[in-house]
A protein has these predicted regions:
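Short, polar N-cap/turn motifs at the start of nucleic acid-interacting alpha helices
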Residues: 125-132, 246-266
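Short, basic (Lys/Arg/His-rich) helix/loop patches that form interaction surfaces
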Residues: 6, 90-101, 162, 178-187, ...
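DNA/chromatin major-groove-contacting recognition/catalytic segments
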Residues: 144-151, 244, 265, 269-285
């Protein structure tokens, strides 16, 4: 449906006209955001060229999203509930073949790092005395994990120092210990200096990790009806911290998001659910 009249002179377009266009435009959210950005830039240019005195597009707002049941279900599928997490980790820890995968998965649940950041951690990045880990890089997949080439993190916000919980310290120390054992007992072990590695010393690949958790899920009596990838453990931390009233800014700082739509969605969803539970409790008093 075409609602923006391109024959209009730019000085005749006001904020109400642009607002009506945004409200009536039948487009996806991403397209609507793009249209708004184009309008902002167009009218900014017109102001700079002195065709108009101010930018009406800046006063118009994107219409609020109306959440559907499908939207809610999609958000809930981005993180694991406590019982789902326990069942999956128990299965990963059950066999030697996936034990290392279980340790890495649990570490990400507590730390919130991306898998590329986790497998780039070296012992020298960890300060056990101060209980912190320095997230300063990710592994470059283009040259292959076996070469262990470390590059910078995804964004400036991703470059961070993260406090370590008791469980994270236990996991890191256990991984370092089993790596030492592998190094002394396996001829194939290639010591590339990373913590989260396979029994042969190569950093755990994202694809291998995802396949392992997918197969572990399939072995469960009641498989989890969610798309399981390494991201779900990071998102699970966001939901757990939100449930425990951690500020959004603090959560974003820990997981390394400068501005994440997914983090916001999960945080908003969980806190809204908590508000609803409070109302149910009050109604039952």
């Amino acid at each position: 449906k075409k609602v923006f009249d391109l024959s209009l002179r730019i000085r005749n377009v006001d904020a109400k006209y642009i607002q009506r266009f945004l409200n009536e435009c039948e487009a996806s959210r991403s397209k609507l955001e793009r249209y708004k950005m184009i309008l902002n830039l167009t009218f900014d240019y017109s102001v700079n060229m002195e065709y108009i005195s101010d930018n009406p597009a800046r006063r118009a707002k994107l219409p609020k999203l109306v959440k559907t049941l499908d939207d809610i279900e999609k958000t809930e599928k981005k993180f694991l509930e406590p019982d789902e997490l326990k069942r999956l980790l128990d299965e990963l820890y059950r066999t030697d073949k996936t034990y290392r995968i279980g340790l890495l998965a649990e570490f990400m649940v507590y730390n919130g790092c991306r898998i590329g950041e986790a497998i780039a951690i070296k012992p020298e990045n960890i300060d056990f005395d101060k209980k912190v880990v320095h997230i300063h890089g990710t592994l470059d997949k283009t040259v292959g994990y076996a070469k262990g080439l470390k590059t910078t993190t995804k964004t400036v916000a991703s470059f961070r120092t993260v406090s370590l919980s008791k469980r994270e310290i236990e996991i890191l120390k256990e991984f370092i210990k089993i790596n030492e054992l592998s190094k002394n007992t396996r001829k194939e072990f290639a010591d590339l200096g990373f913590v989260f590695v396979t029994k042969n010393g190569v950093p755990i690949q994202n694809n291998s990790f995802n396949l392992a958790i997918k197969r572990a899920n399939e072995r469960l009596d009641e498989p989890i009806d969610k798309h399981l990838t390494s991201h779900i453990f990071r998102h699970t931390l966001v939901s757990r911290l939100a449930e425990n009233n951690a500020p959004l800014k603090a959560i974003m700082s820990r997981v390394g998001h400068s501005d994440s739509r997914t983090t916001n969605k999960i945080y908003t969803h969980v806190t809204k659910k908590m508000d609803d539970n409070i109302l149910d409790l009050l109604d039952s008093l």
